[in-house]
Swiss-Prot record:
Keyword flag Cell membrane: yes
Name the UniProt record assigns to this protein: UPF0754 membrane protein tlr2287
GO cellular component term, pick one: plasma membrane
Organism: Thermosynechococcus vestitus (strain NIES-2133 / IAM M-273 / BP-1)
Domain of life: Bacteria
Keywords from the UniProt entry: Cell inner membrane, Cell membrane, Membrane, Transmembrane, Transmembrane helix
Protein family membership: Belongs to the UPF0754 family.
Membrane disposition: Multi-pass membrane protein
Organism ancestry: Bacteria, Bacillati, Cyanobacteriota, Cyanophyceae, Acaryochloridales
Length: 414
């Protein structure tokens, strides 16, 4: 057995471990570096640039093929689109778009928006609505439910309050039936012909004491004297009539009559006839005068002012937010039904438009070798380090085997 030093047995494992470790580390480094080709004497040094920088375009194509072939398949894109376009997300997007559009409109000139709305309203009320009213009013059921409801809920139940009846009675006595107007009415009524007719009727159609008075005394002279008194004694007649109105409590009687004046006291058949007459009267008036009335009113209305008020009221209206919520919900449901039905066709048409493979290739090609190395190192740093360590371990094991062989050979030497 030949003597063998410990260094002979120790060096192979250490050298193998060091060589294996740094060889793998160099190999991994050469995947990325150098980033650019190196030239010596006008000739490119082999293995420059690194493997990945030299084949970056081909790598980009392989990455794109792998992603689109196994990851982003049409089926996966459909599933992704379904998750992305859920009803709640679509509703939120639509609501945001509506709010943004409304804010944009509000930020613009109100005067211009008001002018556009004013032109629309002027055209509708001045031209379109009168023509529509002429056509609609020819129908037998034109506004029938609305007019019936108006008659039943307003006119039938209409009854003056105490204050209203008192004011109306005062107006009637002061404007419609003042003493002077009553005096003139008596004068106009007591014509010669009227007096003669009354005298003859009383003489022929009375009996008892009234017949004696009518035939012996007569009323002709009395009525003539009353007429003369009204004509000649105007102030005194007005005072007498005023005293008579007060004595007869005519104001109180008018108040009571006006308070009791209501359609509810009429028979049901009469009320129905009045309702039908009311409906026919309104329809006839609209047929004959409705169009001209609407046109006349439209010409006198300041549509710009009204439009500006509408826009400002709409802008500050609390119901606008609720309306946007409802509209967003309905549009989201409609869009969801459409997408559920045509999702496959939409994705099929969208893939060529998106051109995902070209996007991936361009992004990989546009990435610098330094950033590409950092990205790969960030993803598989631990795995690459494990490969380096594995190289060191394998080199060490090979060195151990070699040391064992040397030791065995030393045993065979006499």
């Amino acid at each position: 057995m030949a003597d063998i030093s410990y260094w002979t047995l120790l060096v192979p494992p250490l050298a193998g471990g060091v060589i294996g470790y740094f060889t793998n580390d160099l190999a991994i480094t050469m995947l990325f570096r150098p980033y650019k080709p190196i030239y010596i004497g006008g000739k490119q040094v082999p293995f420059t640039p690194g493997l990945i920088p030299r084949n970056q375009e081909r790598l980009a194509r392989r990455i794109a093929d792998a992603i689109l072939g196994s990851l982003l398949t049409p089926e996966e894109l459909q599933n992704l689109a379904r998750r992305l376009l859920q009803v709640q997300r679509v509703k939120a997007v639509i609501h945001w778009l509506l709010q943004t559009s409304l804010s944009q409109i509000q930020a613009q000139s109100e005067q211009r928006s008001a002018q556009v709305l004013a032109n629309i309203l002027r055209d509708f009320f001045g031209s379109a609505l009168p023509r529509l009213m002429k056509v609609w009013s020819r129908r037998e059921d034109f506004l029938e439910p609305q007019l019936n409801q108006l008659f039943d809920q307003v006119l039938v139940e209409l009854q003056l309050s105490d204050e209203q009846a008192e004011k109306l009675a005062d107006w009637l006595l002061s404007v419609m039936l003042p003493p002077d107007r009553l005096r003139l009415a008596i004068i106009d009524f007591l014509t010669d012909r009227t007096i003669n007719v009354l005298d003859q009727e009383l003489r022929q159609n009375t009996s008892g004491t009234y017949w004696v008075v009518a035939n012996l005394v007569g009323v002709r002279n009395t009525l003539i004297r009353l007429r003369e008194y009204c004509l000649n004694e105007r102030e005194a007649c007005n005072r007498r009539l005023g005293d008579l109105i007060t004595a007869l409590a005519l104001r109180q009687r008018l108040v009571e009559a006006l308070q009791n004046l209501t359609l509810q006291s009429l028979p049901l058949g009469t009320v129905r006839e009045l309702r039908q007459l009311f409906r026919q009267t309104v329809r006839s008036y609209i047929q004959e005068q409705g169009a001209s009335v609407i046109e006349t009113v439209s010409q006198t209305v300041e549509w710009e002012t009204i439009s500006l008020s509408i826009l400002r009221r709409l802008r500050d209206s609390a119901s606008l937010g609720a309306s946007l919520e409802v509209v967003s919900d309905e549009l989201a449901l409609v869009l969801d039904r459409y997408l559920e039905r045509d999702m496959e066709l939409i994705v099929e048409r969208a893939i060529p438009i998106l051109d995902l493979d070209r996007v991936i290739v361009d992004r990989v090609k546009a990435t610098s070798p330094e950033n590409l190395e950092l990205a790969i190192q960030g993803i598989v740093r631990s795995e690459l380090q494990a490969i380096v360590r594995l190289g060191g371990i394998l080199g060490f094991l090979i060195g151990v085997v070699q040391a064992g062989v040397l030791y065995w050979q030393s045993l065979q030497v006499p």
